[in-house]
From Swiss-Prot:
One of the protein's GO biological processes: virion attachment to host cell
Full protein name: Outer capsid protein VP4
Organism encoding this protein: Rotavirus X (strain RVX/Human/China/NADRV-J19/1997/GXP[X])
Pfam families in the record: Rota_VP4_MID
HAMAP family for this protein: Rota_VP4
Protein keywords: Capsid protein, Hemagglutinin, Host cell membrane, Host endoplasmic reticulum, Host membrane, Host-virus interaction, Membrane, Outer capsid protein, Viral attachment to host cell, Viral penetration into host cytoplasm, Viral penetration via permeabilization of host membrane, Virion, Virus entry into host cell
Site (Probable cleavage): R245, I246, K260, N261
Keyword Transmembrane included in the entry's annotation: no
A Gene Ontology cellular-component term: viral outer capsid
Family classification: Belongs to the rotavirus VP4 family.
Superkingdom of this protein's organism: Viruses
Length: 823
């Protein structure tokens, strides 16, 4: 995977996102239907700068979003994911029996589907997601009860073999919620005929089948299902319960049958862990306390300070503590609102002694983004994170009192008529991001809440709806009530929550699940010597010889703020070492390192990515399906003309390989930390793509800008650093055009695919090729010329032909990239 592609998920909620159920479902990996791209956002707030270089996600719902599956091998088409066999709403504290016909039919269907490669899912969803509940099974010879649970729980029949059932569960204890239904259907003891199941809260039970596969399992005996006879014994990547070793735990089971109130324990559950090569992939479930604030501001101006000249919402940082598993958790959230509408009237004709102004409003479809992080957790040390999911479905309302308005006039009585309005918020989607707060810089979870308040025009409404409108300078509606009980709402009012009100705090307990990529060797985080010797020993001498050249180049380029480590490691890792004099020896060493890691990262790449859509993934690292989460991945299926550019696995692996610290060079080289590599990954290197990869509408827009038709055979470069578009047409003419940055962003957001990120711009590639073959643009036809111009390996071999001046010119361009990356 490309450096940017792999690490973008540390800042982009787009790669792993869960969306709410009310949104539309789409099939995935359908290029004709996928034409929206996320946009780049940067926010700044007063004295602090919060760098959210995120890509807004493109979301594709499937029915499997709430299930924490591992890796399935089938399509994520909705009609292939899951088949429901049984659904029933059950009342609280009511003994429930299933008829023999229903049990036999369900067992028959499950077994038939199992023979076809399907697994059975036993899902229990409480009507109240915040309520604790337990599930129980009772018969003459067997009784068991689950531990108190909250939210959706499921048990999955992963395998049936030798009269044993292999069951995956989202709960860490046995028996889990869902086992009561499994026992009811599969238990063959005659005692099962009179058995009953019971739930302490109203629930909906759903039994379905899927071809997805799952993580850890526990094993129980098929005929008697006696969970009391099970004890856990650990094996690699699974929990196995040996039925041959009988340990009675009646007291424990019976104690759980007593229904009693209990407080929620905020804990973490490790769902799965696996090692593959250099990496460890960890899937965990946490219960976190999300506490955040929404705070507005208003600025009065004008000659006498009676005009509202500015308003909006602050970026609010909240630091707090809470308990989880007996430990104190220090957490930080950063909440920001992006309002899109206003209320009130800006009328200078009123005069300087009267109020005039408009107030920003959090209104229909506006987004509230909350970033959450903890001081000490696995995510903070992760290189990569994906597969974010949460069970949070709750809606909440943001409102205030009219007398809380923050702004005042300088005219007696110093008050301004207003109505704060109301904003109804609902969880929309989430993922991962990178934040810079007052005391933390690193990875964070993101939660995005969408305002679902109705978008209503002026008119007559009942009082409750009228109070949902915000206004300033006037109340939102007339005081006089009409005969039918309605009130007239002014056209200066807007449905939503006004911005000129003090901080409103919210606090919720939320379950989250995510997958992280960590080094399998703990030493690898700082560069284990053994690992470095196995892969990078060939580079050590070259690095040492390079230091003087690096320092000289830094002096010449006047960028002393960039360390030699940044320049040397990043230049080699991103295949741009030709900017330095005498670099050929290091290139050979780097090539050797590439060969050593080649083939060792492919399976890791497959484990990291599903068929869901994220910007700029190489198609040649396509991996199996991960149907449990909702976004589909957009992969850049490279056309043959781009096939010789470096692939993503090579670039990413090289960076982390070369960042290994060794004793021989540790005192001389300062290596990149993960947070720095993330910033570099998001430094938006140029995008190179054939014109056919750009949407027809965008090509027309570009044609208007440059006042020329674009040859459909052209190769195009979109450079977000220099804000230029370069076009190399079939006549071998290379032209560069300066354009507005919004235009480039808009084009990239609509890119159909078939593109590649590269630190070689077309201009640089032309210089490199000219250095070895001055007449290359003359003697080669267009097709052959493109084969040479877009071949990274051939370009690496010609660096000895560059003059110092030519290398210096190329270095200046690369310097701009680094400065942009580390700004």
């Amino acid at each position: 995977m490309s450096l940017r592609s792999l690490l973008i998920t540390t800042e982009a909620v787009g790669e792993t996102t869960q969306t709410s159920d009310h949104q539309t479902s789409f099939s995935t990996r359908t290029y004709n239907e996928i034409n929206d791209r996320p946009s780049l956002r940067i926010e700044k707030d007063g004295e602090k700068a919060y760098c959210f270089k995120n890509l807004d996600p493109v979301r594709y719902d499937t029915r499997m979003g709430e299930y924490p599956f591992d890796y399935g091998g089938q399509s994520t088409e909705n009609n292939q994911l899951q088949f429901d066999l049984f659904t029933k709403d059950l009342k609280a504290d009511t003994d429930i029996d299933l008829s023999d016909d229903v049990k036999d039919d369900l067992k028959r269907q499950i077994m038939e589907y199992y023979q076809q490669g399907y697994r059975a899912i036993f899902l229990v969803r409480p009507q109240n997601q915040e309520q604790h509940y337990i599930a129980s099974y009772s018969s003459t010879n067997l009784n068991f009860t689950s531990q108190p649970s909250i939210g959706v729980n499921l048990s999955i029949l992963n395998k049936i073999q030798e009269n044993k059932l292999y069951i995956y569960s989202t709960q860490p204890h046995i028996p889990s919620v869902g086992c009561e239904m499994i026992a009811k259907i599969f238990r063959t003891d005659i005692d099962n005929e009179n058995s009953l199941i019971n739930y302490s809260a109203p629930v909906t039970v759903t039994i379905s089948v899927t071809k997805a596969t799952f993580g850890d399992t526990f094993v129980c005996n098929h005929p008697n299902m006696n969970y009391q006879d099970l004890i856990p014994t650990m094996t690699k990547n699974s929990i196995y319960h040996d039925v041959k070793r009988i340990t009675k735990i009646h007291e424990y089971i019976n104690s759980k049958k007593k229904k009693k109130n209990s407080t929620s324990k905020i804990g973490g559950i490790q769902i799965a862990e696996s090692k593959d090569g250099f990496w460890k992939i960890l899937t965990k479930n946490y219960q976190i306390k999300l506490k955040f604030g929404v705070e507005g501001y208003g600025v009065m101006g004008g000659t006498f300070g009676n005009w509202l000249i500015d308003s909006g919402f602050k970026t609010v940082e909240t630091n707090y503590e809470y308990q989880r598993n007996g430990k104190t958790i220090n957490a930080t959230t950063v909440a920001s609102v992006k309002p899109s509408r206003k209320c009130g009237t800006r009328s200078p004709v009123f005069g300087q002694l009267q109020f005039s102004g408009e107030m920003m409003v959090l209104s229909h479809n506006d987004i509230l983004t909350v970033f959450y992080t903890e001081r000490e957790w696995a995510l903070s040390n992760a290189i990569y994170a994906k597969n974010f999911a949460t069970d949070f479905k709750r809606q909440f309302e943001i409102t205030a009192q009219s007398d809380e308005l923050l702004v005042r006039t300088n005219v007696v009585p110093h008050t301004i008529k207003n109505t704060p309005g109301k904003a109804l918020m609902e969880y929309s989607h989430g993922g991962f991001g990178q934040i810079d707060t007052s005391d933390y810089t690193g990875m964070a979870l993101t939660f995005r809440f969408r305002c679902i308040s109705e978008d209503l025009p002026e008119g007559y409404y009942d009082r409750d709806k009228a109070l949902a409108f915000a206004n300033v300078g006037l109340t939102s509606f007339q005081d006089r009530q009409e005969a039918n009980g309605t009130y007239w709402v002014y056209n200066t009012s807007t449905v939503g929550f006004g911005s000129c009100y003090p901080k409103k705090e919210f606090e919720y307990d939320i379950n989250v699940t995510y997958t992280t990529l960590l080094p399998s060797d703990p030493e690898f985080t700082t560069g284990g010597t053994n690992y470095a010797q196995s892969v990078t020993a060939v580079l050590e001498e070259s690095f040492i010889n390079l230091q003087n050249q690096v320092n000289e180049m830094l002096t010449r380029m006047n960028i002393s703020d960039l360390t030699s480590g940044v320049m040397s490691v990043f230049s080699v890792a991103t295949s741009f070492p030709q900017i330095l004099d005498g670099i050929s020896d290091l290139l050979k060493a780097a090539s050797s390192a590439f060969k050593k890691v080649k083939g060792k990262v492919g399976s890791v790449a497959k484990r990291l990515r599903g068929k869901r859509y994220v910007r700029l993934f190489d198609e040649n690292v396509s991996i199996e399906e991960t149907p449990r989460f909702l976004d589909s991945i957009r992969s850049s299926r490279r056309p043959s003309i781009l096939s010789n550019m470096f692939n993503d696995d090579e670039t990413f692996t090289a960076l982390h390989t070369l960042a290994s610290r060794t004793n021989s060079v540790a005192s001389d080289v300062t290596y990149l930390q993960p947070i720095i590599t993330t910033r570099i990954a998001n430094s938006t290197p140029p995008v190179i793509a054939p014109a056919s990869s750009v949407t027809y509408a965008k090509l027309k827009d570009i044609s208007k800008i440059i006042n020329a038709e674009i040859d459909p055979k052209s190769i195009m470069e979109f450079n977000q650093i220099s804000n230029t578009i370069s076009i190399l047409d079939s006549t071998k003419k290379l032209a560069q055009y300066a354009v507005d940055p919004d235009i480039i962003d808009g084009i990239l957001n609509k890119m159909v695919g078939g593109h590649a990120r590269s630190l070689f711009s077309l201009k640089v590639r032309k210089h490199l090729l000219d250095a070895v073959e001055k007449d290359a643009f003359v003697k080669y036809n267009y097709h052959d010329l493109m084969g040479k111009l877009l071949n990274d390996r051939e370009l690496l071999d010609i660096t000895n032909n560059l003059s110092s001046q030519k290398q210096f010119e190329l270095a200046k361009e690369f310097r701009d990239l680094l400065i942009n990356a580390l700004a």
